[in-house]
UniProtKB/Swiss-Prot annotation:
Gene name of the encoded protein: pyrH
Keyword check for Cytoplasm: yes
Keywords: ATP-binding, Cytoplasm, Kinase, Nucleotide-binding, Pyrimidine biosynthesis, Transferase
Subunit text: Homohexamer.
Activity regulation, per record: Inhibited by UTP.
Protein function: Catalyzes the reversible phosphorylation of UMP to UDP.
Family from the record: Belongs to the UMP kinase family.
Gene Ontology annotations of biological process type: 'de novo' CTP biosynthetic process; UDP biosynthetic process
Record-given protein name: Uridylate kinase
């Protein structure tokens, strides 16, 4: 029995690389599509936002001499590429999926609106919302917070390469311990890098809980949806 009726699933672009150094790993993409299909078959309405860091990151582009606005726009296009790839993988797995874009670019994807996204989800389609917020200077974490709030999701599931939030980076500090749950106030007080400050504050102010979990372990998405205590829950 699914704990949530409607979710916003946030995936990082880097996670799509799998074992590669760059781009999209077809095996990882197929694994993600299979996990998403599994919870879709339980009747969960699914909205997805994917980053673009496996292709281009706006902020690092600024450090390489690109104008920040142009760099962020290139990053937005990278999220569209990833969204199209995931959409194709979902369709190949037998699931209806639709890509909506924050900036008009028909026929690549339909222009995003809250009402279009909700209508598609209620009709059994998985909706992938690409292009960030459509504006520079906003991360895809902020874009996913915005979309999660707009589509009235019950929760944001932040699929990462680590199994939750720790007191410190577990790869650098062997004494780091994991939180099973933590409040937004505590996240902000400790300066924990769950998401950027704008995204975190948006979720806090709009009472959208986040579950940070390891998406790369097959079966974890279903466990989170079923209410199993894996990962870290962030709440008010």
């Amino acid at each position: 029995m699914a704990k949530y009726k409607r979710i916003l699933l946030k995936l990082s672009g880097e996670s799509l690389m799998g074992e590669k150094q760059y781009g999209i790993d077809e095996k990882r993409l197929a694994e993600y599509a299979a996990q998403i299909k599994e919870i879709h078959e339980q009747g969960v309405q699914i909205g997805i936002v994917i980053g673009g860091g496996n292709i281009f990151r706006g902020l690092s582009g600024a450090n390489k001499g690109f104008d920040r606005v142009k760099g962020d726009q290139m990053g937005m296009l990278a999220t569209v590429i990833n969204s199209l790839a995931l959409s194709s993988a979902l369709v190949a797995a037998g699931v209806k999926a639709r890509v909506l874009t924050a900036v008009r670019m028909e026929p690549i994807g339909e222009f995003y609106s809250k009402w279009k996204a909700i209508e598609c989800m209620e009709n059994g389609e998985i909706v992938i919302m690409s292009g960030g917020t459509g504006n520079p200077f906003f991360t895809t974490d902020t874009g996913s917070s915005l979309r999660g709030i707009e589509i009235e999701a019950d929760v944001m599931l932040k699929g990462t390469r680590v199994d939750g939030i720790y007191t410190a980076d577990p790869e650098k500090d062997p004494t780091a311990t994991k939180f099973s749950d933590i409040t937004y106030d505590e996240v902000l007080k400790r300066g924990l890098k769950v998401m950027d400050l704008t995204a975190t504050c948006m979720c806090k102010e709009n009472n959208l809980p986040i579950v940070v979990f390891d998406m790369d372990t097959v079966g974890n998405l279903k466990k989170v949806i079923s209410g199993e205590e894996i990962g870290t829950v962030v709440h008010n």
